[in-house]
């Protein structure tokens, strides 16, 4: 990502060219690209683009003894290999250009395997092997359901087909006959929807609705009662349970925005006002044929709901809607919104590359080389993605972020190689120039590739499949970027080098006819390009002559320290404010119809959470009084929990004890206890699917239900889940808690653990790499400091930018480690390697050598992902936000904090 460029005149480091490349004596050569003789003692200045190389001893002299901190154990062999590779590419440019092109064309055929089927959200965005998935398997294997006869939403183990409508009154309350009349019209219109299939058959709501007894499950129990008896007094309702003709109606979860009055019987309160109502249309799901017909009805519902709402001309109420299909459909539609941004991203990167690589003279100008360099990066994306699809790695929507990142990161190697080329002498052959350029950039582009690829591949250890697949795709594509940079792009540079030779010879011709044109177009400053490669970029001079001296003044250091203190305090505070977990509404685009639905649900229906099963997982002696007392004790602990409403507990055993007492039977006798269960279920059929009796007349498992409250935030969901599981685990009776929502709630408990583990693994990998390639203790310390500081900063400022800690942001935190390493390792190494006498001058020299490459790397990456800021989906905007924070804080550490802090030690 960053070039560690050494300016001319700072250290007269020279490296003897190999015998096969550089001649041993001065002679005029006719080699292609050779302009004039180059005496061996007038070699061009060395431009190191990695950590400075050890000076090689003159031929025939004994090498000096090694220094204590010998740093070229890997660097020297790597540079030697690249030197030979550069000579080979320079001698055969067309081979190394066409080879990657053909490889890209071959691997690109894998794009035909881009998935056409639906992406499983649960599989991709919930933790692998989460406890809730094991709990679900237990429920499915021990408890049956029947959505064609006795459906109960709280007893289902997985999400069923449904359509949900939230009705919000324009008045203070909808508990008025006029409002109920409008809602009733809406309800009848929904139930009247019918699907006409291609074969002419119709799918009617009564055919696909989930049933209890012989009728469809009412979408709202109070509305159903009012429809049966319009004289029902809506001003005398009790909450959360209301009695209608000796029948209990649960209003909790069906009415929101409530104003409660005085207490009535028991623990009920008078329902004075209610602003919102929920209508839930449950459909059959268990039978595959029924499921298909239900989904066809839901699709028809989605296609025609807005037209139906317009036809009804509802005046007193506003409605929003959502179905069990909505999240999946909207998630798939989200990916289409980002496709146009690819074109904009490539245009911006090409413009940036052209501006960065343009020169005023036509010989050194690398405008078209930069353009082809961007296409080389695009080839790596096609190759990497094609290879992954060929071997069957699933492509998930989050991977669509990857090309934007690769585009920004991939061009960094291009800038480094062009910079090294510009430092070579025009008097050398193309092969020699490319060979020298390769040897200079070997360590720089290799170390940045290794660190970034390692950072991504550590993400494979994540518990989220979406993170695994993103990291596999991106890490592999970065390897292709590296491979194409040293082959395809090197060949492009070699071909452009031949162009330089042709133009140079043309400029040298004493042709008076074109002299004015030459001066105006090709040599605007009236002098020929420097043949020895002295190419001081204005930005390098800015860091050396202005920024560096200013930053090392006492006042500037004091201000920098204050800024850092403010930065780290703010970041630590923000770390404690970060929300955990992926809000499922964020999987859809901003203009999706599900967004207002979730907003209304959060505003009016957040008081009551999921209804949780409390499952006795093993055979216990329910007729034993001690066992019942232990079980009652555990149920009391559940009810006393801050996230549980004790008034809405439902447990068959409690009802059975009352039944046994009313019938005068002894509940402490096994035979009496077991023989009366059948009669009990006849009176209370609702408990039929809560007791699992084996053929040997043993209760192998049973369940009750508790109602959760106040779990609207992700932190409360996490605490509720952990506390309920803790109570179940500590109970003397084997218990388990489960609700289908726990499948997604588990991410809240897993995300921090996964993030910490991935960050630790990646940081350890970076530390090992730093010791191997730049083994200086001071460098390792500053690399560790920078990584920790940037991670804390990015995590903290995520909270200020309304970004959750989820599987998407976890990816970026892993990326953060690679960039922090790049920005800090080179700066600190340049500082400790400097021969300047004072720490201030060492810092200035480090900025002179690396300030512009750090800035260029940050800008190119930000440009690559900045178009995602215009995306209409959270998952893409989040990627931009965090990458911007990573680049901004990483560059700030490399350009400001570390150069200042190094002067204090």
Curated annotation (Swiss-Prot):
Ranges for region Disordered: 1-67
PROSITE patterns (UniProt xref): SSD
Keywords carried by this UniProt record: Cell membrane, Cell projection, Cilium, Endoplasmic reticulum, Flagellum, Glycoprotein, Membrane, Transmembrane, Transmembrane helix
GO cellular component, one term: endoplasmic reticulum
Residues bearing attached sugar chains per UniProt: 146, 199, 229, 233, 647, 661, 692
UniProt cross-references to InterPro entries, sorted A to Z: Patched_domain-protein, PTHD_SSD, SSD
Gene3D superfamilies, per database record: Multidrug efflux transporter AcrB transmembrane domain
Stretches that traverse the bilayer: 94-114, 337-357, 369-389, 391-411, 441-461, 475-495, 558-578, 759-779, 781-801, 813-833, 849-869, 882-902
Membrane topology: Multi-pass membrane protein
Keyword Hydrolase attributed: no
Tissue: Expressed in germ cells of the testis (at protein level).
Limits of the SSD domain: 338-495
Subcellular location, record wording: Cell projection, Cilium, Flagellum membrane; Endoplasmic reticulum membrane
Annotated family: Belongs to the patched family.
Function per UniProt: May play a role in sperm development or sperm function. However, does not appear to have an essential role in spermatogenesis or male fertility.
Protein name: Patched domain-containing protein 3
Organism: Rattus norvegicus
The encoding gene: Ptchd3
